[in-house]
Amino acid sequence: MEKMPITKSGFENLKKELEHLKCVLIPANIKDIEIARAHGDLSENAEYTAAKEKQSFLHGKLQELENNLALSNVIDLKMLSDDRIVFGATVIIEEASTGKQTNYQLVGPFESNISENKISVTSPIGKALIGKSIGDEVKVHTPGGIRNFEVVDIYINPSEL
């Protein structure tokens, strides 16, 4: 499979999430199953059924995290320039129709989170921004139509270095 870019902090967050899953959530679920099993008849034991469903979910999440870590390619942001938008850069863009400015960090698909203004380089807006410079106009095709932006600033966040 193809390696996916990820920031150092994104990679560390995935590792912490995996560790929490292995050391806290899965052991707690094992105890829940044991307690529910002790209640007797498993065929009509809702507690047991719920704990087994959670076990399945947790093991699916475990596989997903292990796969994501294996496919991760940590990019050293210290080596990046801030004259063009590249993976890891934080950009400030201004929407032409409203004048509203928004900042986004371009990250890999494993760490994108719109509530943290982290968008994937594979998203429509991420693809449109890659390679642009300050002052460039950017057209983004969205389900709601074409949106026009101007690149106001590009920088590498010092906390990511």
UniProtKB/Swiss-Prot annotation:
Belongs to the GreA/GreB family. One of its GO terms (biological process) is DNA-templated transcription elongation. This is Transcription elongation factor GreA. Transmembrane segments: none annotated. Keywords: Coiled coil, DNA-binding, Transcription, Transcription regulation. HAMAP family: GreA_GreB. SUPFAM superfamilies: FKBP-like (SSF54534), GreA transcript cleavage protein, N-terminal domain (SSF46557). The lineage of its organism: Bacteria, Pseudomonadati, Thermodesulfobacteriota, Syntrophia, Syntrophales. It comes from Syntrophus aciditrophicus (strain SB). It comes from the Bacteria. Pfam families: GreA_GreB, GreA_GreB_N. The keyword Acetylation does not apply. Residues 46-71 form a coiled coil.
